Design a protein with these regions (language model features):
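A glycine- and charged-residue-rich anion-binding loop/surface
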Residues: 1-209
Length: 209
């Protein structure tokens, strides 16, 4: 943002040019916005699910998301098993199926924290904050989200890895991006099956000659 609080936009000129003083019209890329919202809300649900499965000691250490994927770093001193990962994924999908509504409220920062709203450690907040709530998930957040958790449709954890002492990173996908990832995984096996089928047909054909 600019020093006076105005939002600044970075643009890439595809055709033509822009000059100082020009007026421009901005439009939202609805598809990109929707999938980004899916991943953002899913990140909130993931943190809630991790706390439900591993315990309240889980704390966010960072995150990244875009229209295709989400990444969540967190601190946890214990060992994470495959069963923990499965339970976490299942818990997120349970919250999705509950169609929990987006309840957003502007509150005094101290009052918000007293309600149990999660805040990112080390982050500086103003006197008033925006609280985003989806059922048991409640966080201080200024970003865009879906109107209810059912909009996410589906969620899957791609990977989980250690990023240092007691720090883990989860990468996950939602909805149509999940389908794309599954296709990437299945395609090599599918191509191999097609090749084997062609070889089998050739062997049978050669045997008949």
């Amino acid at each position: 943002k600019a020093p006076n609080g105005q939002t600044m936009h970075f643009v890439r000129i595809i055709k033509g040019d822009i000059n100082k003083g020009d007026y421009v019209t901005l439009t939202v890329d609805k598809e990109n916005r929707f999938t980004t919202c899916q991943n953002h809300t899913a990140t909130h649900l993931l943190q809630r699910a991790l706390k439900d499965v591993l315990g309240e000691e889980v704390n966010q250490a960072g995150s990244y998301l875009d229209a295709k994927t989400l990444r969540f770093d967190f601190k946890y001193t214990g060992k994470i098993t495959d069963d923990d990962v499965i339970k976490t994924e299942e818990r997120v999908n349970e919250l999705i199926k509950e169609n929990l509504p987006n309840e957003t409220e502007i509150m005094d920062a101290d009052a918000a924290k007293k309600t149990g709203a999660m805040a990112l450690f080390g982050e500086k907040y103003g006197k008033t904050v925006r609280v985003v709530k989806f059922g048991p998930s409640k966080e201080l957040c200024g970003g865009t989200h879906v109107t209810n958790t059912g909009n996410i449709r589906s969620f899957a954890i791609k990977t989980i890895e250690s990023k240092g002492l007691n720090v883990y990173r989860i990468e996950a996908v939602c909805d149509t991006n999940l389908e794309i990832e599954l296709f990437k995984i299945i395609k090599p096996y599918n191509d191999e099956m097609i090749l084997l089928l062609k070889k089998a047909k050739k062997i049978v054909s050669d045997a008949k000659e």
